Structures are given as structure tokens and as C-alpha cells.
């Protein structure tokens, strides 16, 4: 599975110096499953049809936390296919179950890790559906969730139902109609990389 451009911008801006995150590991985004426990676990669900893009932010934008972050993308059961957007949860039950399993794996495998999470477009529905299903103990380990182009924004009334609103940051661009409960894609839906810096600062601020 691969991380999106937005996930890479977040992960590298928030947590890494140029040599801290191996290029292959970032591209595959499988460090929770295959790697050692880290102080922070970052779980991200990409947008529909989104391929992995190995893009790093400028070094001056980084807030370095060398070697302290495990980056994990949701997949392969989450296929990021277009038809799943039209399902009742705006993504597939398999995708939700997979993301739920990743949160639970992080909490069980790495009991001392602090979990941060994010999603873009259909990936926001994956985050919404999975986090709602978590036990209160696992939810408590999630320090912050950033959602970009939240496809469940209208349905969930600007939150993840049953999850602490103070731990949720929603980015909905002006003119992005998916945030209004439709599946109409406009140019505004592709502008969220510009919010990566602000989202990074917010996520880092939620850590203990």
C-alpha cells in the first residue's frame, strides 16, 4: 500500500529530518505492521484512486522528531476505489474494519505509543467509520485526527460521532461540495496540501 502526497507532507513536515524516514518505508507506509514500536504512530487513509507519491517537504518546514514515528497507511483491503464512496458509510465495510484493526494493533503492540491519524476524501470516511467502532480505551490513545475534505462532514455534523471533538480537526475548503453531503468533486477538493503545515502543527500540539 502507498501513502498519498498529503500523508507524506504531513508525516515528513511533522516528524522527520531528511534521513529519519526511509524512502521505501514512507512509500509503502507499513511501519506499524512491519517495524518496531515508536513513540508516535501515524495512521493515514488516502483518497479514492490515489497512488503513492514519494514527495518530501522542504527541510525548513520540518519539526524534527528523529526516529520516533511509525507511519502506517490503510490497505490493502482498503482499495480506495471510486464505487465505495456511494456505500452507506461512504467507504467499504472491509476498509473500516482494516483501519479499526490498525488502531487496535497499535494500542496492543505498542501500549506506550501516542496515535495520530488522518484521512483525505474517502479516507476520511475510513477514519470516521473505524474510530467510532473503537473501545474507549483505544480511542483514548488517539491524540489527534486531521480530516481533509471530510465526506461525512454533513452526516456527522462536523465531528466523528462518539469521539472527542477536541481531538478532531476538520479541513473543508470553500467550495468543496463533499463537505456538504454530496459526491460532487470540485477543484476545491484538491487544495488540501496547502493545509498540511497547519495540520501538522495542530497534530503535534496534541501530543503529550
From Swiss-Prot:
Q: Site annotation (Transition state stabilizer): which residues?
A: 48, 122
The protein's UniProt keywords, in alphabetical order, are:
Disulfide bond, Hydrolase, Secreted, Serine esterase, Signal
Q: Which reaction does it catalyse?
A: cutin + H2O = cutin monomers
GO CC annotation terms, alphabetical:
extracellular region
* E.C. numbers: 3.1.1.74
SMART domains named among the record's database cross-references: Cutinase (SM01110)
Task: Supply one GO molecular-function term.
Answer: cutinase activity
Q: What is its main location?
A: secreted
Localization (cell): Secreted
Does the record bear Disulfide bond in its keywords? yes
Q: Which residues form the active site?
A: 121 (nucleophile), 176, 189 (proton donor/acceptor)
Posttranslational mods:
The 2 disulfide bonds play a critical role in holding the catalytic residues in juxta-position; reduction of the disulfide bridges results in the complete inactivation of the enzyme.
On the tree of life, the source organism's domain of life is Eukaryota
Gene Ontology biological-process annotations:
antibiotic biosynthetic process; carbohydrate catabolic process; monocarboxylic acid biosynthetic process
Keyword check for Acyltransferase: no
Q: Which PROSITE patterns match?
A: CUTINASE_2
Read off the PANTHER family from this record: CUTINASE 1-RELATED, CUTINASE 2-RELATED
Q: Name the job this protein performs.
A: Catalyzes the hydrolysis of complex carboxylic polyesters found in the cell wall of plants. Degrades cutin, a macromolecule that forms the structure of the plant cuticle.
- Record protein name field: Probable cutinase 1
